[in-house]
């Protein structure tokens, strides 16, 4: 009986291990919906909006003896194709451009982190939101429709593959 239980436990653990490493617990790099925040210092209202960003698992390796060999570049989930969209911030004073542009992921891939165009930092536990304002007019800002401003750009990577606030001055 113990042999049968041991065999059953071994089968469950081996199948479970394969499922966990390739299944839904670690989704591969792909576009996902994310909520971002846009604000300008001169405009009184911060807007949150939903766009698609690149996120997910990219296979990687860490050397067992890192001092003996050079570091291996770790792939990150980043844009393969993207387009840009814009939103209008309400309440901006005259002379301040109320438009804010942001990337929309069309497709993603695992590739090297390009520090010039991508936030290569750590994953954020909490979604970013608008900074607290002293004025009560900034509470519960209205959601703004998205407007496309350009065509898809193959191979371009302009912004972070992690949710970031879009803040311009």
UniProtKB/Swiss-Prot annotation:
Signal peptide range in chain numbering: 1-20
Composition bias type Low complexity, residue spans: 145-158
Entry keywords, A to Z: Disulfide bond, Glycoprotein, Hormone, Secreted, Signal
Domain of life: Eukaryota
One Gene Ontology molecular-function label: hormone activity
Positions of the UniProt region annotated as Disordered: 131-169
InterPro entries: Cystine-knot_cytokine, Glyco_hormone_CN, Gonadotropin_bsu, Gonadotropin_bsu_CS
Subcellular location: Secreted
Family: Belongs to the glycoprotein hormones subunit beta family.
Name of the molecule in the record: Lutropin/choriogonadotropin subunit beta
